[in-house]
């Protein structure tokens, strides 16, 4: 009946759990810091260009929308917007002339958004910034295609795990 007794942690498994916890917490900190740093990089790009009419969160949102026509809900579910108040930023971007919005003919509650010419110009600034990074990230940052493939695969698996933990209450 020993197989029914709970498995006790050995020093090796305890050590492994401590190491895994440490690595997991470090990854969480890095993900948070990378998002903040990305916003800092975008803000710096707009500061250099003397653009004070838009903030980094809004510029990133415009880049993520690109040529698409989306609802506010789609912005969140597709991961295009990470903030808590997408409606506020959309309203602000409409007021600033960066976004056009139109009620859906099918569902009057849904508002579909797309970029104006000014919004596309902002999105292009972010695209040019990313292209500049791609031109030097291997040489300067030491990150090549293989590194990005591994990193993306790991982050996708973490995303799937978190999604499953919500859906299946893991």
Predicted segment positions?
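Charged, amphipathic alpha-helical coiled-coil/dimerization segments
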Residues: 7, 91-150
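N-terminal helix-turn-helix DNA-binding core of bacterial DNA-binding proteins
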Residues: 40-85
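C-terminal regulatory/oligomerization modules of transcriptional regulators
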Residues: 1-19, 143-170
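Alpha-helical linker/hinge and terminal dimerization helices associated
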Residues: 34, 38-41, 45, 79, ...
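N-terminal positioning helix adjacent to the helix-turn-helix/winged-helix DNA-binding module
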Residues: 23, 56-58, 118, 147
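DNA-binding alpha-helical recognition surfaces that contact promoter or target DNA
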Residues: 88
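N-terminal leader segment of winged-helix/HTH proteins
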Residues: 1-52
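Generic structural concept
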Residues: 32-35, 62, 66, 116, ...
């Amino acid at each position: 009946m020993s197989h029914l007794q709970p498995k006790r942690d050995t020093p090796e498994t305890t050590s492994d759990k401590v190491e895994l916890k440490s690595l997991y917490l470090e990854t969480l900190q890095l993900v948070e810091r990378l998002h903040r740093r990305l916003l800092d990089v975008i803000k710096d790009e707009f500061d250099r260009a003397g653009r004070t009419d838009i903030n980094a969160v809004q510029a990133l949102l415009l880049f993520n929308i690109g040529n698409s026509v989306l609802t506010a809900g789609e912005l969140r579910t597709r991961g295009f917007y990470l903030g808590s108040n997408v409606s506020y930023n959309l309203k602000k971007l409409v007021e600033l002339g960066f976004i056009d919005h139109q009620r859906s003919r099918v569902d009057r509650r849904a508002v579909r958004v797309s970029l104006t010419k000014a919004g596309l110009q902002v999105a292009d600034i972010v695209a040019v910034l990313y292209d500049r990074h791609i031109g030097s990230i291997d040489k300067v940052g030491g990150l090549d295609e293989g590194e990005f493939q591994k990193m993306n695969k790991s982050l996708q698996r973490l995303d799937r795990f978190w999604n499953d933990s919500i859906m299946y209450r893991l």
